[in-house]
Amino acid sequence: MMISDLPEDMVEEILSRVSIISLGALRWNDLSKARVICKAEARQQFAGFMIKGSKVCSMRFDLHGIQNNNVEVVEPSIKQIAKFNHVEISQVFHCDGLLLMMSKEVSNTRLVVWNPYLGKIWSIQHRSAYHSENRYTLGYDNNRKPQNLEVAYHSIKGITYLFNGGEKIGEGPTGCLLCFDFTRERFGPSLPLPFHVAHLYTEQLAVLLHNWGAFAMEIWVTTNIEPNAVLMEQLLKNYLLYTSDFIGSFFIDQEKKHAVIFDSSLSCGSVACIIGETGNLRTVDLGVAAVPYRQLPVCSYAPSLEQINQGQELPLIGLTQIFMEQHKYWVSTFLDNLITKYG
C-alpha cells in the first residue's frame, strides 16, 4: 500500500509527527499543495504573526477552553522573532506558508519574504522606490511561481483578491471582489458581495459585516470560490456588546461558530474579541498601542515547504489608488520587475 492510498486525515496525522528534515525531499502537491497541514491541531488553536511595536511577533491562541457557559481561554502566546530585531516592520502578509513583510524605514523601505517553517529569508530588490502607503501581497501563476501584487489584501489558493467598494467612496455598488490572475497578469470579472468588509481565513474567504446602526455583526463564509464565481452562507450573527473604532483581521472556528476579531480601539487599545452566537465570550488585551484608523497587522499561518529561487525575476503589477475631487478615485497600473535574493 502506498501512502497516497491512505485517508487524507491519516496522512496529515503522519506528516504532523515527522520532522521537516525528513520531509524536505518530498512534495505533496496533489494532497496538500506542498503545505504541511495538521487539521486536528488547527481546530484547537490559531497560529499566526502580528506586528507589535514595529517588530514581527509570533502569536498562538488556544481555542480548546472556550465554552459558552464556562468561559476559559488560555492567554495568547506572543513572542518577538529575534532574527528581525534590527528591522522595523509595517506590514505582514501570508500566502501558502510564505510571509511577505515590508520594512518601516522611509528612506530604505524593503520587502522581505520569509518561510518560518524552513527558516529561509529572501530579500526583494525593487528597481524603483517603494511608497509607504502601498500594500503588497503574494500569489502564484499556473506554474506555482511566486508573484507580487501591490494594494491587494487577501490570497486564497495562490490567487489574490482585493475588495472594491464602488466608483465613489460610500456610494455605488455595495461592494465586490476583484480576482487578479498572476498567469495572465490581469483582473478577472467582479464578484458581487453583500457586504463592505472582507478578510481571509485559510482555504475559505470569510466576509464580515459590521452594521453600526444595529450594533450587529455577521460573518459569512464561502462554500465555493473561483476566479469567476463565489457562493456564501452565513456562519453567525452577533449583537455587539461593545463599540469599536476600527475592526481589523479576524479568524473563525466554523465547528463551534466562534470568531476572534482583532480590534484597535483608542479607548481599549488593541484587543482580541472572542464572540459566538450567544454574545461576547471574552476580550483579551494584546498589549499593543492602538493607532487611529489603522488595522492591527495580524495574519494567520500554516507551515509550508514553498521556496523562491535565488535571482528569480518577479513581475510587479503596481496599483496606485489616486483620490480626486468629489471623492472619485481611479486606479493606475504599472509593470516592473523584482529580483529575489537569498539572505
From Swiss-Prot:
Domain F-box: 1-46
Top-level taxon: Eukaryota
Protein name: Probable F-box protein At1g67455
